[in-house]
């Protein structure tokens, strides 16, 4: 694949790898649309009303085929956008090219340097003729943090941000506590139709896909440590066990640890398993989960990867002085002084997007339908959202699920008036309290 780095000119407001990939990208976007019923339903519902007319959205989320469907949905609903990727390895260059060919300002390519990554984010915050954003759409919190720290003058015109992932939500709550958050935020991650679907079912498929593409290793019979048993860890553990691995879990939370034990997993510590496991997967959203000391103990040819947002769950920095042998894109062997080799996937960054193509379109339709609804909420009803961190109301969460039922052949039972009265709900929902745990 060519990588001639198409850059912006007087008539081209984008920076991507190769515009010649656009036709391939467009074909895959059209296929993805058939698997994203939630977004397509929003297009049909709002194509005339244009509820995002006047919105100028700066987006920072993995520039994939599925994200292309999201971007074009936002635009069909009236928004203008400028976009970068939230990970240096996650861009699908044909997706970026397909959008750039249509004149959409995209600043993303697979294999950015750190410096290029931040320059791409900066490019989304200002455009021709004084363009600046009045909404943000973020994944991981880098766009939000960059805006607050480097461009505070923009904050007074920003109606809010919708945040996609656990790591970004943690950062939002920290900023709110510190008083540095200057606009409202909607926590999309904690919508049930995001966290219980994207995080769990998405990872259940994309983790194995990425390990297989990267290594061709036999999963059956392997001892695998999954660090973290939240929704992401749960999905990873399910798929690894289904392939015949013996799965071990590390956890800090006694509730999650007990859940893992009740599912039949061994709950252990990294210190206990570092010298005996074959594959290690971090899924915590935290730092220093696999340390240099752990990696010194690991056996030859152990595989190390991360499916959390950032690259600090595994202490990759401590390996930089060792010899690295590249096997293929995003697959490296790190050779220790004693000759031992560890296989490191995606340099410790998101393995499912570095070594594969991320989650399937259908589950991303759940997440991205939430994102569109969050953007509409922030744009249409700013008076409802003083500075703070919010989740979408239950009726919208249920609506997202409802939009996806037909695609999987599911039919709902309808409550009678008597039944609805008996349990104290409206026949049309919401059917659960805000505090219900699915």
UniProtKB/Swiss-Prot annotation:
It is an enzyme of class 3 (hydrolase). Substrate binds at residues 64, 139, 164, 194, 198. Its EC number is 3.13.2.1. The keyword Cytoplasm applies. Its main location: cytoplasm. It is found in: Cytoplasm. It comes from the Bacteria. One of its GO terms (biological process) is S-adenosylmethionine cycle. GO terms for cellular component: cytosol. It catalyses: S-adenosyl-L-homocysteine + H2O = L-homocysteine + adenosine. NAD(+) binds at residues 165-167, 199, 228-233, 251, 286, 307-309, 352. SUPFAM superfamilies: Formate/glycerate dehydrogenase catalytic domain-like, NAD(P)-binding Rossmann-fold domains. Pathway: Amino-acid biosynthesis; L-homocysteine biosynthesis; L-homocysteine from S-adenosyl-L-homocysteine: step 1/1. Coiled coil: none annotated. Keywords: Cytoplasm, Hydrolase, NAD, One-carbon metabolism. GO terms for molecular function: adenosylhomocysteinase activity. Its cofactor is NAD(+). Pfam families: AdoHcyase, AdoHcyase_NAD. PROSITE patterns: ADOHCYASE_1, ADOHCYASE_2. Binds 1 NAD(+) per subunit. May play a key role in the regulation of the intracellular concentration of adenosylhomocysteine. HAMAP family: AdoHcyase. Belongs to the adenosylhomocysteinase family. This is Adenosylhomocysteinase. It comes from Coxiella burnetii (strain Dugway 5J108-111). The gene is ahcY.
